[in-house]
Amino acid sequence: MVTLPGTAAASTPTLMWSGAKRVNILCNVAGGPGIDHVALTQQLCREVKRLALKRSPLPIETIAIGDPAVLGADAVTLLVHASVARHGKDRLLAFNVRPYRTSSEQASVLFGAPPRAATISTYIARSPALDAALAAALSETLPWLARPVAPQPLKSRR
């Protein structure tokens, strides 16, 4: 058996976080007829904020589209883009979380946390499936929630 390093978390945060003094959360939920995307956007932002605040060394606020706080040089904004579709009696919420900072073009994140999905009821009310999906995405986005990854053993092809 050969042991190679797996996808490992960086030992230090990416340059995007250098000098950051606050975190903004900006959500946008799209949906078809009968989907209250405004209410779902607000609920999703509240859940992301609740999870992001765990062990956070920085203040975290939710903001709305058009808020000039996105342009703050000392802020990292988490862009949470989601889409909702009916899935039987439930709804399927697919989302992506990406950090954005205006002052860090050289340190921008090209490929961050992969898109995830979870079923939800009419409202995002602390759904265990959504909590797990959001926590996984945030652990790949926020340095203080990063989960250490150990080297993974791989079987050699002999």
Give the role of each language-model region.
Residues 2-46, 147-158:
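A structural "domain/chain start" motif
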Residues 4-6, 11-15, 106-158:
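C-terminal/domain-edge helix-coil "capping" segments
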Residues 25-75:
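N-terminal segment of the mature soluble domain
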Residues 21-23, 46, 50, 86, ...:
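A generic structural micro-environment signature
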Residues 66-120, 124, 128:
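Surface-exposed short loop/turn segments
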